[in-house]
Amino acid sequence: MGRARRFQWPLLLLWAAAAGPGTGQEVQTENVTVAEGGVAEITCRLHQYDGSIVVIQNPARQTLFFNGTRALKDERFQLEEFSPRRVRIRLSDARLEDEGGYFCQLYTEDTHHQIATLTVLVAPENPVVEVREQAVEGGEVELSCLVPRSRPAAVLRWYRDRKELKGVSSGQENGKVWSVASTVRFRVDRKDDGGIVICEAQNQALPSGHSKQTQYVLDVQYSPTARIHASQAVVREGDTLVLTCAVTGNPRPNQIRWNRGNESLPERAEAVGETLTLPGLVSADNGTYTCEAANKHGHARALYVLVVYDPGAVVEAQTSVPYAIVGGILALLVFLIICVLVGMVWCSVRQKGSYLTHEASGLDEQGEAREAFLNGGDGHKRKEEFFI
């Protein structure tokens, strides 16, 4: 009897040790990642919950909810679910200062707690693109792209004409966020004026496949060009002619000058900006007219030779010159085609003649052989006598 009492307490302790872990309450959490300004859900999963006190605290150890009752007056935190299986809270408009570990505490005979780590990412805003100095044709342009806030550090890329450009990037950490910059250099010409260069920023805070872009329109300065267009190709006495000086340049020339060689313009002429109007033309108006334009990068000059014909004169318009060129090209093509056809016919005739010659030669040899076979060697002798 005494021996039985001796083993009673050890058996009870062994049963408690085996049964305790299997019947105890537990709490589990999961880490959460959210973009700045987004919505995060923090969940505490309960196992074998028996109605004990559940407390949720923020990273500063301030109590947010006590058994489903709000304890901190921050309306961004809302209790979404409180059940024997889980406690779920919702955080809207997430901020960097909300980042950290959120405590899920279960108060029983032994306090249990787990930490859910909230990570807040910062998506980049549209990059800021600037040019270091004014671009001029024949030189280089340097562009810079800046993203002042991002987390993690944004990756910057340059694109031009759907091709990626190689830039040089640098970053600086400011507290929890990064400031990232990138520069790119390339040569430019006047044809690049108005072209588009894109700076693109990406990081994990943006949805997959999304990016923030800024388009920069190139401003390339270059010297002017000038060309005169006439309102008609052939002018006669009494006609009105309008000459237009088509000017390009960056910056665009703001003044155009009209001249007529070493002579002054006719008194009837009206020069207004890019146009020169010559009404009531006479032969005395003949001459070389010029328009000139300039900017800080150079100047341009265009010429137009005016010939005024009599009213009854028969002349060919200047626009007929392109047709003459086209006609000459067509004539040359026809000549080449004829040459090719003649060559093909000549080769065909020559090949056929060679075939007939060989065929006739073969017939002679066969006839001679047949005659020799029939007459024995007489044929050979007769040939000798014939030749003698």
UniProtKB/Swiss-Prot annotation:
The modification Phosphoserine is found at residue 361. Glycans are attached at residues 31, 67, 286. Disulfide bonds join 44-104, 145-199, 245-291. GO terms for cellular component: cell leading edge; cell-cell contact zone; membrane. It is found in: Membrane. GO terms for biological process: cell adhesion; negative regulation of peptidyl-threonine phosphorylation; negative regulation of peptidyl-tyrosine phosphorylation; negative regulation of protein phosphorylation; negative regulation of vascular endothelial growth factor receptor signaling pathway; negative regulation of vascular endothelial growth factor signaling pathway; regulation of cell motility; regulation of cell population proliferation. Residues 25-324 are extracellular. Keywords: Cell adhesion, Disulfide bond, Glycoprotein, Immunoglobulin domain, Membrane, Phosphoprotein, Repeat, Signal, Transmembrane, Transmembrane helix, Tumor suppressor. Residues 346-388 are cytoplasmic. InterPro entries: CD80_C2-set, Ig-like_dom, Ig-like_dom_sf, Ig-like_fold, Ig_sub, Ig_sub2, Ig_V-set, Neurexin-like. Residues 124-219, 224-307 form the Ig-like C2-type domain. GO terms for molecular function: protein phosphatase binding; receptor tyrosine kinase binding; vascular endothelial growth factor receptor 1 binding; vascular endothelial growth factor receptor 2 binding. Residues 1-20 form the signal peptide. Gene3D superfamilies: Immunoglobulins (2.60.40.10). It is a single-pass type I membrane protein. Its main location: membrane. Residues 21-119 form the Ig-like V-type domain. Monomer and homodimer. Involved in the cell-cell adhesion. Has calcium- and magnesium-independent cell-cell adhesion activity. May have tumor-suppressor activity. Belongs to the nectin family. PANTHER family: CELL ADHESION MOLECULE 4, IG-LIKE DOMAIN-CONTAINING PROTEIN. This is Cell adhesion molecule 4. The gene is Cadm4.
